Every structure is written in structure tokens, then in C-alpha cells.
A protein has these predicted regions:
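Binding/recognition "hotspot" determinant
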Residues: 1-38, 42, 46, 52-55, ...
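Membrane-water interface regions at transmembrane-helix termini and the short interhelical loops
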Residues: 44-57, 157-160, 164, 187-194
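Alpha-helical transmembrane segments and their helix-start/interface "positive-inside/aromatic belt" motifs
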Residues: 54-69, 194-203
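Single conserved hydrophobic/aromatic residue that forms the stacking wall/gate
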Residues: 291-301
């Protein structure tokens, strides 16, 4: 549970309790489904008995198939939701061409660890520039490299948190949908089940988008840091990494909104997203600076 694995432990605990909720709620869901089936079939039988010219056999077959489909959905809801998740996650990872697997995507701590690994060459370069005299001679370069390292960590940590929230959202959506799916058996309450299915698909698209962003981002930053070839990166190299980290940070913050745009039919990313990313990054860096300034003051007191 140490290091970046703490977020994996949180996800494991949440997942275990949410998956246990399906077993705890199965009795109530079965009761709701049975009640709605009885109401629907009784009403249908009354209407069929009044309509002498209707084809009762055809209507009975249609009603049986309809009830059977919903019974299958209710009985296998958790497994079907898992298949949807793995399908969308697999598509996103395949599109990005990364070495990440679906199992790795279920570990947000691995995403955070990827950021630590991507920023480690910068820290090693900073340590090579440190010295009693060289620290003052290379102060600007050290500051730029440290700033680039902080932004890389920030970008990947935000991606890890976004992935954690998305996974929990998907689990909670499927659990809440498990309770609402039986209402699709009755015509007057069918809209509740329709929204559940739409929400599950929307959450799956969000997983796909995050999988693409994480896969491409991890590949790009491994190429960035490997491109130094053991040499100390210059200020231009550091600023290039800052630009890349800001781009990944913007995608991590606003990228999941693409899923909402696909469902609603409107674009979600634009200049406002870029400005918001810059302001968010600036605010976080300023907060870190204030913390570093306040620490010597507290020690002096």
C-alpha cells in the first residue's frame, strides 16, 4: 500500500464494497422485477381478452421475449457491465498503441508511477548540476528542470485521479442501474431504465477517452526522457517538456468531457479549456511556492 499504490488500495476497497452491493440488493431487485412483471402481464391479459380480433399468440410471444431479455439483463447485469468496461478500455488502449493492458488501467497507481518514472531523468540531471558553486551558476537551468519535473508529476497524478474517479463512477452507475433496470419491464416507468443504459455507455466512452490519453501520454513522455541520451537537458528541452506536460494536463482535466460531448452531440474542448489549464497549473505552482516559503518561516519561529 506504500507509494503510489495507496490509490490502488482505495480503488480495491471501493470496488469490493460496490461489488458486494449487487449481492445485497439482489433480493429487492428480484422483488421489484417480479412485481412489475405480474402487473404488466395482468394488464396485457386484460387488454387481450377485450380485443377479440387481436392475434393473442403473437402478442404473448412478443411479451415473453421482452420479459426474457430483461430477466437476462437483471441476472447478468454486473458481468455485462464488466464486459462493456473491458471492451471500451481495450479499444482505447489499442488505439493508443501503448504497452498498457486493461489490468494496468484498473491500477491508477501505475499511471502515477509512470509519471514518477518519466520525471526521474530530470531529477538525475538536477543532481548532476548541484554543487557548492555550480548551484548558483546553473540556478536558472535547475529551476526550469525542477518546474518541468513538477508539471510532469502534476499531469500524471491528475490523470491517475481522473482514472480513479471514472472507475468509481462506472461502478456506482452500474450498481444504481441494477436497481433501476427492472422498471423497464413496465411501460410507464421504462424511461428510468433507458437513462441507466445511456449512462453506462457514457461512462464507458469516458473510460475509452482516458485510456487513449493515458496510453499516448505515457508513450510520449518515455520518448521525451529517453531522448536526452544521458546528457543534461538544456533550458529549451525543459520548456519543451513543460509544454508537453501542460498539454497532457489539459487533456487529463478536460478530456473526459469528450464523452459528454459525444452523448449530447456538442464539442467540449476549445480555447477555454487551454486557458483553464494554464490558470489551474499556475495556481498549483503558486501554492507550492507559498508552501516552500512558509516552511522556513515556521522553522524560524
Amino acid at each position: 500500500m506504500g507509494g503510489t499504490g495507496v490509490i490502488d488500495h482505495f480503488l480495491e476497497v471501493f470496488t469490493r464494497y460496490i461489488d458486494g452491493g449487487f449481492g445485497l440488493l439482489s433480493g429487492e431487485v428480484t422483488f421489484i422485477a417480479t412485481t412489475l412483471i405480474v402487473i404488466d402481464v395482468v394488464l396485457a391479459a386484460l387488454f387481450w381478452s377485450w380485443g377479440a380480433d387481436d392475434d393473442v399468440i403473437a402478442r404473448l410471444v412478443k411479451k415473453t421475449l421482452f420479459v426474457g431479455v430483461f430477466a437476462y439483463l437483471i441476472g447478468n447485469w454486473n458481468n455485462l457491465a464488466r464486459i462493456v468496461f473491458e471492451s471500451y478500455a481495450g479499444l482505447g488502449l489499442k488505439a493508443s498503441g501503448t504497452s498498457f493492458s486493461v489490468a494496468d488501467l484498473l491500477r491508477p497507481g501505475k499511471v502515477a508511477q509512470t509519471g514518477l518514472d518519466a520525471g526521474r531523468p530530470l531529477l538525475e540531471s538536477i543532481s548532476d548540476l548541484m554543487g557548492w558553486v555550480s548551484v548558483f551558476e546553473n540556478f536558472i537551468q535547475i529551476a526550469c528542470l525542477l518546474f518541468a519535473w513538477a508539471l510532469i508529476l502534476l499531469a500524471f497524478f491528475i490523470l491517475a485521479v481522473q482514472l480513479f474517479v471514472t472507475l468509481i463512477e462506472f461502478k456506482l452507475t452500474t450498481l444504481a442501474g441494477f436497481v433501476l433496470i427492472p422498471f423497464g419491464l413496465f411501460g410507464k416507468s421504462a424511461f428510468m431504465a433507458e437513462r441507466v443504459l445511456g449512462n453506462v455507455i457514457s461512462s464507458g466512452i469516458k473510460v475509452l477517452v482516458l485510456a487513449v490519453i493515458i496510453g499516448i501520454g505515457s508513450t510520449l513522455f518515455s520518448e521525451f526522457t529517453a531522448g536526452f541520451g544521458g546528457a543534461t537537458p538544456t533550458i529549451d528541452d525543459a520548456m519543451a517538456i513543460v509544454l508537453a506536460a501542460l498539454s497532457l494536463l489539459g487533456l487529463g482535466i478536460f478530456g473526459p468531457g469528450i464523452a459528454n460531448g459525444l452523448v449530447s452531440g456538442g464539442p467540449q474542448l476549445g480555447a477555454g479549456a487551454a486557458i483553464g489549464t494554464g490558470l489551474a497549473a499556475g495556481g498549483m505552482v503558486m501554492a507550492l511556492s507559498l508552501i516552500h516559503i512558509s516552511e522556513p518561516t515556521r522553522q524560524a519561529e
